């Protein structure tokens, strides 16, 4: 719903479904989705990649992943991320409970780091929560760049970096 402030400025109220009226009085529908389609997400990635290329001249990010599978082909551990512009980013690192403390997480991270070096990256960044063993990354040379407290409630989140 739109209104005006005492100064005559447009004010917008955010709802899960709303209409946005611009200064040109063009009406646009906006809906919050909790399960967007893969094609919609890929559309956004393609548009941001185009924008990034136009702004930086750098090609699209290249994905990096490694997996540990059991004899049945089920994933028991994996790492996923990408490299772009001389930096690699770990998006996901997970090891099943039954395979933890066996060095698999370290092996996956080392493989990711080696691939980042091969791609001539100078640093690796990642984000983690207090309950996701940030000390695991600290032991491997990652340092915190900053912390967001109470995310999630009662916990904290940090972004970490390692120069390679």
Question: What do these predicted ranges mean?
Answer:
Residues 116-130:
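Conserved GNAT acetyl-CoA-binding A-motif
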Residues 3, 8, 12, 16, ...:
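Acetyl-CoA-dependent GNAT
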Residues 91, 99-100, 123, 136:
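Acidic/histidine-enriched, beta-strand-rich ligand/metal-binding domains
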Residues 101-114, 139:
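Conserved acetyl-CoA-binding loop-helix of GNAT-fold acetyltransferases
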Residues 125-127, 143-159:
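Conserved catalytic-core motifs of GNAT/GCN5-like acyltransferases
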Residues 108, 132-133:
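Conserved short alpha-helix immediately C-terminal to the canonical SAM/SAH-binding motif I
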Residues 44, 137, 142:
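Conserved active-site tyrosine of GNAT-family acetyltransferases
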């Amino acid at each position: 719903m739109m209104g005006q402030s005492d100064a005559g400025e447009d004010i917008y109220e955010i709802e899960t479904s709303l209409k946005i009226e611009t200064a040109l009085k063009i009406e646009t529908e906006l809906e919050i989705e909790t399960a967007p389609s893969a094609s919609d997400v890929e559309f956004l990635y393609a548009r941001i990649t185009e924008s990034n290329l136009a702004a930086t001249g750098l090609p699209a990010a290249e994905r990096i992943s490694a997996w540990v599978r059991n004899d049945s082909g089920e994933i028991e551990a994996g790492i996923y991320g990408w490299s772009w512009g001389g930096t690699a980013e770990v998006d996901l690192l997970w090891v099943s409970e039954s395979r933890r403390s066996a060095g698999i997480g370290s092996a996956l991270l080392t493989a990711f780091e080696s691939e980042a070096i091969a791609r001539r990256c100078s640093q690796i960044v990642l984000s983690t929560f207090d309950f996701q063993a940030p000390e695991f990354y600290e032991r491997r040379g990652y340092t915190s760049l900053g912390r967001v407290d109470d995310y999630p409630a009662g916990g904290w989140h940090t972004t970490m970096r390692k120069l390679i």
